Amino acid sequence: MKILGIDPGSRNCGYAIIEKNVRKTALIEAGLIKIKPNTLQYQITELCEGLDVIFKNHKFDEVAIEDIFFAYNPKTVLKLAQFRGALSLKILQLHGDFAEYTPLQVKKAVTGKAKAQKEQVAFMVKKILGITKEIKPLDITDAIAVALTHANNLCLR
Protein backbone atom coordinates (compact mmCIF):
# COMPACT_ATOMS: atom_id res chain seq x y z
CA MET A 1 0.00 0.00 0.00
CA LYS A 2 1.39 3.38 -1.02
CA ILE A 3 0.63 6.31 1.29
CA LEU A 4 1.28 10.01 0.73
CA GLY A 5 1.76 12.08 3.89
CA ILE A 6 1.65 15.87 3.71
CA ASP A 7 2.73 18.53 6.21
CA PRO A 8 1.28 21.78 4.84
CA GLY A 9 2.91 25.13 5.49
CA SER A 10 2.99 28.61 4.04
CA ARG A 11 6.72 28.52 3.22
CA ASN A 12 7.33 24.83 2.58
CA CYS A 13 5.02 21.88 2.19
CA GLY A 14 6.65 18.64 3.25
CA TYR A 15 5.60 15.42 1.56
CA ALA A 16 6.51 11.78 2.05
CA ILE A 17 5.63 8.60 0.22
CA ILE A 18 5.82 5.35 2.14
CA GLU A 19 5.13 1.78 1.09
CA LYS A 20 3.50 -0.36 3.77
CA ASN A 21 3.08 -4.09 3.51
CA VAL A 22 2.60 -6.89 6.01
CA ARG A 23 6.31 -7.23 6.72
CA LYS A 24 7.71 -3.71 6.61
CA THR A 25 7.28 -0.02 5.97
CA ALA A 26 9.70 1.71 3.60
CA LEU A 27 10.26 5.32 2.64
CA ILE A 28 9.96 5.68 -1.15
CA GLU A 29 10.45 9.42 -1.50
CA ALA A 30 10.31 12.55 0.62
CA GLY A 31 10.82 16.21 -0.12
CA LEU A 32 9.52 19.73 -0.12
CA ILE A 33 7.26 21.78 -2.28
CA LYS A 34 9.06 25.09 -1.85
CA ILE A 35 6.81 28.12 -1.84
CA LYS A 36 8.58 31.35 -2.77
CA PRO A 37 7.61 34.67 -1.17
CA ASN A 38 5.07 36.22 -3.52
CA THR A 39 1.37 37.04 -3.65
CA LEU A 40 -0.92 34.54 -1.95
CA GLN A 41 -2.47 33.58 -5.30
CA TYR A 42 0.96 32.80 -6.76
CA GLN A 43 1.96 30.79 -3.69
CA ILE A 44 -1.23 28.72 -3.84
CA THR A 45 -0.57 28.09 -7.54
CA GLU A 46 2.96 26.88 -6.70
CA LEU A 47 1.57 24.52 -4.06
CA CYS A 48 -1.01 23.06 -6.44
CA GLU A 49 1.53 22.67 -9.26
CA GLY A 50 3.87 20.88 -6.86
CA LEU A 51 1.09 18.45 -5.95
CA ASP A 52 0.36 17.89 -9.64
CA VAL A 53 3.95 16.71 -10.16
CA ILE A 54 3.81 14.33 -7.18
CA PHE A 55 0.50 12.81 -8.30
CA LYS A 56 1.73 12.57 -11.90
CA ASN A 57 4.77 10.54 -10.82
CA HIS A 58 3.05 8.27 -8.27
CA LYS A 59 -0.21 6.45 -7.68
CA PHE A 60 -1.44 6.36 -4.09
CA ASP A 61 -3.76 4.07 -2.20
CA GLU A 62 -4.11 6.56 0.65
CA VAL A 63 -3.41 10.24 1.32
CA ALA A 64 -3.13 11.86 4.76
CA ILE A 65 -2.47 15.46 5.74
CA GLU A 66 -1.68 17.19 8.99
CA ASP A 67 -4.30 19.67 10.11
CA ILE A 68 -3.20 23.24 10.71
CA PHE A 69 -1.96 24.07 14.17
CA PHE A 70 -3.22 26.90 16.31
CA ALA A 71 -1.28 30.11 15.75
CA TYR A 72 -1.48 33.30 17.77
CA ASN A 73 -1.22 35.60 14.76
CA PRO A 74 -4.62 35.87 13.01
CA LYS A 75 -2.95 36.69 9.66
CA THR A 76 -0.93 33.48 9.89
CA VAL A 77 -4.05 31.44 10.66
CA LEU A 78 -5.90 32.95 7.69
CA LYS A 79 -3.01 32.30 5.33
CA LEU A 80 -2.58 28.70 6.53
CA ALA A 81 -6.32 28.12 6.24
CA GLN A 82 -6.27 29.31 2.62
CA PHE A 83 -3.33 27.02 1.83
CA ARG A 84 -5.13 24.16 3.58
CA GLY A 85 -8.31 24.80 1.58
CA ALA A 86 -6.43 24.83 -1.73
CA LEU A 87 -4.52 21.71 -0.71
CA SER A 88 -7.73 19.90 0.24
CA LEU A 89 -9.44 20.79 -3.03
CA LYS A 90 -6.43 19.71 -5.09
CA ILE A 91 -6.19 16.34 -3.30
CA LEU A 92 -9.92 15.76 -3.77
CA GLN A 93 -9.55 16.51 -7.49
CA LEU A 94 -6.48 14.31 -7.98
CA HIS A 95 -7.20 11.45 -5.58
CA GLY A 96 -10.48 11.69 -3.73
CA ASP A 97 -10.86 11.21 0.01
CA PHE A 98 -7.99 11.82 2.39
CA ALA A 99 -7.37 11.42 6.11
CA GLU A 100 -6.60 14.29 8.47
CA TYR A 101 -4.60 14.21 11.69
CA THR A 102 -3.89 16.92 14.22
CA PRO A 103 -0.25 17.60 15.13
CA LEU A 104 -0.95 16.10 18.58
CA GLN A 105 -2.30 12.87 17.03
CA VAL A 106 0.77 12.56 14.81
CA LYS A 107 3.21 13.19 17.65
CA LYS A 108 1.45 10.69 19.91
CA ALA A 109 1.32 8.03 17.20
CA VAL A 110 5.02 8.32 16.38
CA THR A 111 6.62 9.12 19.76
CA GLY A 112 3.98 8.09 22.29
CA LYS A 113 3.81 11.68 23.56
CA ALA A 114 1.32 14.24 22.24
CA LYS A 115 3.57 17.12 23.34
CA ALA A 116 6.78 15.77 21.77
CA GLN A 117 9.22 18.20 20.17
CA LYS A 118 9.81 18.14 16.41
CA GLU A 119 13.30 16.74 17.00
CA GLN A 120 11.82 13.80 18.93
CA VAL A 121 9.45 13.12 16.03
CA ALA A 122 12.39 13.22 13.60
CA PHE A 123 14.37 10.80 15.77
CA MET A 124 11.50 8.29 15.96
CA VAL A 125 10.74 8.55 12.22
CA LYS A 126 14.33 7.58 11.44
CA LYS A 127 14.27 4.78 14.02
CA ILE A 128 10.97 3.33 12.76
CA LEU A 129 12.16 3.32 9.15
CA GLY A 130 15.76 2.31 9.91
CA ILE A 131 17.19 5.46 8.36
CA THR A 132 20.68 6.47 9.48
CA LYS A 133 21.22 9.65 7.50
CA GLU A 134 19.88 13.01 8.64
CA ILE A 135 16.58 14.19 7.15
CA LYS A 136 16.24 17.94 6.84
CA PRO A 137 14.25 20.12 7.15
CA LEU A 138 11.80 19.02 9.81
CA ASP A 139 8.88 19.64 7.43
CA ILE A 140 9.96 16.42 5.70
CA THR A 141 10.12 14.33 8.87
CA ASP A 142 6.73 15.73 9.86
CA ALA A 143 5.29 14.56 6.53
CA ILE A 144 6.82 11.11 7.05
CA ALA A 145 5.25 11.05 10.52
CA VAL A 146 1.84 11.87 9.02
CA ALA A 147 2.17 8.96 6.57
CA LEU A 148 3.29 6.59 9.36
CA THR A 149 0.37 7.70 11.55
CA HIS A 150 -2.06 6.91 8.77
CA ALA A 151 -0.41 3.55 8.06
CA ASN A 152 -0.78 2.61 11.74
CA ASN A 153 -4.41 3.73 11.82
CA LEU A 154 -5.19 1.62 8.75
CA CYS A 155 -3.84 -1.43 10.59
CA LEU A 156 -6.24 -0.73 13.45
CA ARG A 157 -9.35 -0.70 11.25
Curated annotation (Swiss-Prot):
PROSITE patterns with a match to the protein in the record: RUVC
A GO cellular component annotation in the UniProt record: Holliday junction resolvase complex
Chain sites annotated for binding Mg(2+) 1: D7, D139
Entry EC number(s): 3.1.21.10
Summary of subunit composition and partner proteins: Homodimer which binds Holliday junction (HJ) DNA. The HJ becomes 2-fold symmetrical on binding to RuvC with unstacked arms; it has a different conformation from HJ DNA in complex with RuvA. In the full resolvosome a probable DNA-RuvA(4)-RuvB(12)-RuvC(2) complex forms which resolves the HJ.
Superkingdom of origin organism: Bacteria
Pfam families noted in UniProt: RuvC
Signal peptide as annotated in the record: none
Protein name as annotated: Crossover junction endodeoxyribonuclease RuvC
Reactions accelerated catalytically: Endonucleolytic cleavage at a junction such as a reciprocal single-stranded crossover between two homologous DNA duplexes (Holliday junction)
InterPro entries: RNaseH-like_sf, RNaseH_sf, X-over_junc_endoDNase_Mg_BS, X-over_junc_endoDNase_RuvC
Lineage per the UniProt record: Bacteria, Pseudomonadati, Campylobacterota, Epsilonproteobacteria, Campylobacterales
Binding-site list for Mg(2+) 2: E66
